[in-house]
Design a protein with these regions (language model features):
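Gram-negative bacterial Sec-dependent N-terminal signal peptides
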Residues: 2-20
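N-terminal periplasmic/intermembrane-space "pro-region" immediately following the signal or transit peptide
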Residues: 20-126
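Outer membrane beta-barrel
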Residues: 92-283, 313-331, 369-384, 388-390
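Transmembrane beta-barrel outer-membrane domains
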Residues: 100, 146-152, 188-195, 244-248, ...
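Outer-membrane beta-barrel translocator domains and adjoining extracellular loop/strand segments
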Residues: 121-126, 182-190, 223-230, 277-286, ...
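Transmembrane beta-strand segments that form the barrel wall of outer-membrane beta-barrel proteins
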Residues: 169-178, 334-340, 437, 504-507
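Detector for outer-membrane/organellar transmembrane beta-barrel domains
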Residues: 327-483
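Outer-membrane beta-barrel "beta-signal"
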Residues: 522-536
Length: 536
């Protein structure tokens, strides 16, 4: 019932009550009518209060949905959250929200069933292990791999409200890529939920926004402004996204300023962690994720076998800054990263200990550019610096170790990724991406005369041509690159949500730094097919 109809009914009730009251003055015998009139007046007062509450709630919902359209839909495909596709009519019930004590709650996410076939056995689930693609001489390079998985399904809840002129938001998102010690593919397939995002946000009308919690890194390119839930993710089915994609999800405290929806600036302090690779590790070294003093018990990245279950001992948070521009066409970003690395050589009965500290940095860019009347969206991003490895999909190491002093040495690294999404029809999106990640050589000779550092030319590849002896085949990744393409086809879109079917083909190539003997390489081709149901 509209407010206008309710108001007319109230006026009619008032007029009737007045008429009855006048009759009552003329005829004192109808005291029962006086009681009924009083009850009607109380009911009308309650109705007016209820109308005011409904109008306030509707106003809050309209304000939230109008000011931040991106926040009402967590999409997987780039740009879909920001614009309707040609020929599509959105249901008035989408997205479906409900209200509780002045708050607007919006559930989201998708349920997915995926099958994949790899030409090389990575021993991985839905996420590719880019830095561990089997080398050509290994048994895994001669075995294919089939997997089926529902673990990439995501569930989320967005909570919005207002306190005076301040908008309040909270968001939680989870998938099922966690793995308890008893998780397996044998019988029950009992995979555990995994936290992806959990944050709170205060948004002031002056353009200031404060975000705290676990979220996508500020280094991740956005689709619009510098807004949470507007990250520009590659649109495929690979759980590790694309080689060259810059991202983490981690604890952060971020402050953002919006200047008239044209320019945005942001600064963040985010959770640090150090990954390393070294052909020689000095004795008694502390502070690394494999050191005796490291905290253990949590598997950080279960689909990347290079990582241990320890945590590095960190000196300070990573410092990040970003400026975003939207001059009227496209979205453009400049971003920067500062990092701090530390380890320690422990003292012994005959030697003194010492602590080593060094810094890393990164400078990058991002862009999203629409063409062909917004039917074609082209994206490009890159990052260059020292010690930036863990911020990329390939998981290249941040640093190596000086064999003499034990000091961490941030590696020279670079990455780039580009791609496009073509909205061919209202039901069909076509996409393609390519990316490359590189880690520079930083080689030494150890005190014992052996190979040390990262990418040492003294590393022997003699065992890399023997399938049985491949366990002794070691080397440092020089670069990893990928090319991928696929599509998403919307089978249904309406008040019950939407159902999409997608296929993706991935080619990955892994190069090692040269050593003694023929340098091995690795490559893999992966084919995905998925069916997804997005919640309305």
């Amino acid at each position: 019932m509209s407010r206008r109809v309710i108001s007319v009914n109230i006026l009619m009730l008032i007029a009737t009550a007045g008429s009855v009251a006048q009759t009552d003055n003329q005829d004192p015998t109808i005291t029962d009518l006086q009681r009924q009139i009083q009850e009607m007046r109380l009911q009308m007062a309650k109705m007016q209060n209820r109308i005011a509450e409904l109008e306030t709630t509707r106003g809050i919902a309209a304000t939230n949905s109008g000011a931040d359209p991106v926040l009402l839909q967590s999409e997987t495909h780039p740009t879909q959250a920001l614009q309707s596709q040609p020929g599509e009519t959105k249901s008035s019930e989408e997205p479906t929200s409900f209200h509780y004590k002045g708050l607007t709650l919006t559930p989201g996410g998708f349920l997915e069933g995926t099958m994949l076939l790899r030409t090389r056995n990575e021993n991985a689930d839905i996420a590719n292990s880019y830095s561990a693609i089997p080398l050509n001489g290994s048994s895994n390079a001669k075995l294919s791999e089939f997997r089926g998985s529902a673990r990439n399904s995501e569930l989320s809840l967005l909570v919005q409200g207002t306190a005076g002129s301040t908008k309040l938001k909270g968001y939680v998102e989870a998938d099922f890529l966690g793995a308890a010690p008893t998780a397996n593919y044998v019988e029950s397939n009992s995979w555990t939920p995994r936290l992806r995002q959990l944050w709170v946000q205060l948004d002031k009308p002056s353009g200031w926004t404060i975000t705290a919690g676990q979220t996508w890194s500020l280094l991740t390119t956005n689709q619009q402004g510098i807004a949470s839930l507007a990250e520009l993710r590659p649109g495929g089915e690979d759980g590790q996204y694309v080689v060259g994609f810059t991202w983490t999800r981690q604890r952060a405290f971020r402050v953002t300023k919006n200047f008239n929806n044209k320019v945005w600036t942001a600064f963040a302090v985010e959770e640090p962690e150090t990954t390393y690779s070294a052909a020689f590790v000095p004795a008694n070294i502390m502070g690394l994720n494999t050191s005796p003093n490291a905290a253990t018990g949590v598997n950080l990245l279960p689909f990347l076998p290079n990582y241990s279950s320890g945590f590095s001992t960190n000196l300070a948070p990573d410092l990040l800054a970003k400026v975003a521009f939207e001059p009227g066409w496209g979205h453009f970003e400049i971003k920067a990263l500062g990092r701090f690395f530390r380890d320690r050589i422990a003292s012994t009965a005959t030697t003194n200990g010492h602590t080593n500290t060094t810094e890393g940095y990164g400078l990058g860019f991002g862009a999203l550019m629409p063409f062909a009347n917004k039917k074609l969206d082209v994206s490009l991003e890159g990052l260059l610096g020292q010690g930036i490895g863990r911020y990329g999909s390939s998981g290249l190491p941040d640093a190596t170790i000086n064999p003499t002093t034990g000091a961490l040495r941030p590696l020279r690294e670079a990455r780039i990724m580009g791609g496009f999404v073509y909205h061919h029809r209202s039901r069909l999106d076509l996409y393609a991406y390519g990316g490359d990640e590189y880690a520079g050589r930083d080689a030494f000779i150890s005190p014992t005369g052996t190979a040390a550092g990262y990418g040492s030319p003294l590393v022997s590849y003699a065992s890399c041509t023997n399938e049985v002896a491949m366990n002794g085949c070691g080397g440092a990744n020089r670069n990893i690159y990928e090319a991928t393409a696929g599509y998403w086809y919307r089978l249904y879109r309406g008040e019950f949500g939407r159902i999409e079917q997608g296929n993706q083909v991935v080619y990955i190539h892994r190069n090692l730094w040269s050593g003694i003997g023929t340098t091995p390489q690795g490559s893999d081709v992966v084919v995905y097919t998925s069916l997804r149901f997005y919640l309305p």
